[in-house]
């Protein structure tokens, strides 16, 4: 859609009665051109960038290209150093040892495994901490009355009442409490030395390991890629994923079956946490080929036009890294994942910089490092923000905005996908901010995309936790994932630029441009809802 041919002043209805006129937005809106999107993405997804693997040459080229494009737009790029540890977990020498009745059993991959960026051995008695959740606003605490200091803690994955629409958490889609990082930080806060994580026994979805196995070639690729972690991350204790069999053996000390324990917690919302008498454990982690290296987040700020609001920030984000090359030498081009998002942030930086008028709040354009290695660039940013998080009002995160969603091995049997998604955009995480959703829907009256919120009602794939908006949500910043969905080329060498729907990508970015104006200009920015279950009912 082009605004220039109209001769009258066309009001853009935004989040309140206030409107932004055509004359204020037209320059930037029309600057988002398909020809530019195609040219930029053709370069980023080319063989020359070698799959943009984090800490590899192609990733460095992407960093410099993004910075150069910010400079051309008249912005001053900041290369925020992201210190990383790269390593290969040694599965032969790492183990989980369970001691009981004078006997020791050793478990290794695939029965017990985890990644940790240093050689470490920790030991202690084993305690069960339910789902490992402390949610004071919900009056729920799995650690109430449990002494976890110096202990190894066994917890269920996900969260209580996962499939109950009346759940105090969510019930039709998991909240942030269901994530392993939140569980690990909570255990660390309570003095634990390690966490054993098991898929909940009454689950109605694939475990995380089963999900990964669904993606053709995933196990082969993950096995040959090095792991990475933030050097100096706030996480300091290891997490080991254990099999159902190991968990059942440990939980036998309670006198109950694992499924009965889960059902009791879900039914009463009262912790079943307790020591597991007679059991102690040792977690030993050994790595190979460990090295320290720096990557970079590429950031640029457009200052707001209102001195009273310019200290506040709206973020447009994406990640530029992908998966490098396959064992056969072919590249994982990552055109959709996430060349599309990277190009999106760059095109919006150009659009806003070119526009004669500026929003009242400042805009931060952020392209993050090492998302594919565990959201490392965005986790580093929220621990070391360029602009304060308490005045960061909204995050528009792009990750895969260039394709039509289609059934694939990852989604088969788990979620319904429409036959025609050529004009569809998924918005993920909207329950955390109804204000955010309302602003997008108002702006979309000009653009005409079909907006879909199905991923907020899904607990098997937990997509909201899997992109760079999530670290901001953990800090109570309204942050949503703009996402055109999975397809059979996801994380395959066939994710190439010739399969991109550039017309849809342009519409998505124009919608983001209008939404950014709403967030940047309106008197009241969107609010974050800490308890999304309450907001949905």
Regions found by a protein language model. Give the residues of each.
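Soluble metallo-hydrolase cores and metallopeptidase-like ectodomains found primarily
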Residues: 20-25, 104-145, 229-334, 350, ...
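Protein/peptide-recognition domains central to ubiquitin and immune signaling
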Residues: 39-111, 184, 197-220, 234, ...
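His/Asp/Glu-rich mid-to-C-terminal helical/loop segments that flank catalytic regions of hydrolases
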Residues: 350, 483, 487-537
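Alpha-helical metal-binding/catalytic segments enriched in His/Glu/Asp
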Residues: 179-180, 298-302, 316-375, 512
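Metal-dependent peptidase/peptidase-like ectodomains
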Residues: 103-107, 144, 150, 226-259, ...
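Second-shell loop/turn segments in exported
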Residues: 23-31, 47-58, 113-117, 128, ...
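A conserved hydrophobic secondary-structure block that centers on an alpha-helix together
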Residues: 130-212
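Noncatalytic luminal/extracellular "stalk/propeptide" segments of secretory-pathway proteins
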Residues: 24, 50-166, 275-279, 284-286, ...
């Amino acid at each position: 859609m082009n605004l220039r041919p109209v001769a009258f002043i066309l009001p853009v209805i935004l989040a309140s009665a206030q409107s932004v006129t055509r004359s204020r937005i037209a320059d930037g809106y029309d600057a988002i051109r398909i020809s530019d999107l195609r040219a930029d993405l053709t370069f980023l997804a080319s063989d020359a960038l070698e799959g943009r693997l984090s800490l590899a040459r192609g990733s460095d080229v992407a960093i410099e290209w993004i910075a150069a494009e910010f400079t051309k737009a008249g912005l001053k790029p900041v290369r925020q150093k992201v210190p990383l540890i790269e390593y290969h977990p040694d599965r032969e020498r790492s183990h989980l040892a369970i001691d009981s009745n004078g006997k020791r059993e050793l478990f290794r991959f695939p029965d017990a495994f985890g990644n940790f960026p240093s050689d470490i051995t920790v030991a202690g008695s084993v305690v069960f901490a339910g789902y490992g959740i402390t949610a004071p606003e919900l009056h729920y605490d799995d650690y109430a009355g449990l002494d976890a200091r110096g202990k190894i803690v066994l917890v269920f994955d996900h969260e209580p009442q996962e499939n109950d629409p009346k759940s105090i958490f969510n019930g039709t889609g998991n909240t942030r409490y269901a994530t392993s990082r939140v569980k690990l930080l909570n255990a660390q806060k309570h003095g634990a030395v390690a966490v054993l994580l098991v898929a909940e026994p009454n689950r109605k979805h694939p475990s995380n390991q089963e999900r990964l196995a669904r993606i053709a070639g995933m196990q082969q690729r993950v096995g040959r890629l090095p792991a990475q972690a933030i050097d100096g991350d706030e996480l300091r204790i290891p997490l080991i994923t254990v099999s159902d069999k190991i968990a059942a053996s440990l939980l036998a000390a309670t006198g109950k079956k694992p499924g009965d324990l889960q059902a009791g917690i879900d039914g009463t919302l009262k912790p079943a946490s307790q020591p597991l008498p007679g059991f102690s454990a040792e977690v030993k982690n050994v790595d190979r080929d460990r090295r320290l290296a720096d990557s970079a987040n590429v950031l640029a700020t457009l200052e707001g036009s209102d001195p009273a609001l310019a200290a506040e920030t709206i973020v447009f984000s994406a990640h530029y890294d992908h998966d490098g090359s396959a064992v056969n030498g072919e590249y994982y081009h990552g055109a959709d994942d996430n060349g599309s998002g990277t190009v999106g942030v760059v095109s919006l930086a150009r659009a806003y910089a070119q526009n004669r008028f500026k929003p009242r709040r400042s805009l931060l354009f952020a392209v993050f490092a090492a998302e594919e290695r565990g959201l490392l660039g965005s986790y580093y940013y929220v621990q070391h923000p360029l602009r304060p998080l308490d005045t960061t009002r909204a995050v528009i995160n792009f990750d895969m905005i260039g394709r039509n969603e289609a059934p694939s091995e990852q989604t088969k049997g788990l979620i319904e996908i429409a036959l025609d998604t050529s004009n569809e955009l998924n918005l993920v995480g909207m329950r955390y901010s109804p204000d955010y959703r309302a602003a997008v829907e108002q702006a979309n009256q000009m653009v005409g995309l079909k907006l879909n919120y199905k991923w907020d009602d899904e607990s098997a794939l937990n997509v909201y936790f899997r992109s760079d908006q999530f670290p901001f949500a953990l800090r109570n910043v309204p942050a949503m994932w703009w996402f055109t969905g999975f397809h059979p080329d996801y994380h395959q060498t066939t994710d190439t630029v010739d399969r991109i729907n550039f017309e849809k990508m342009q519409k998505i970015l124009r919608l983001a441009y209008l939404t950014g104006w709403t967030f940047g200009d309106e008197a009241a920015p969107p609010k974050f809802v800490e308890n999304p279950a309450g907001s949905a009912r």
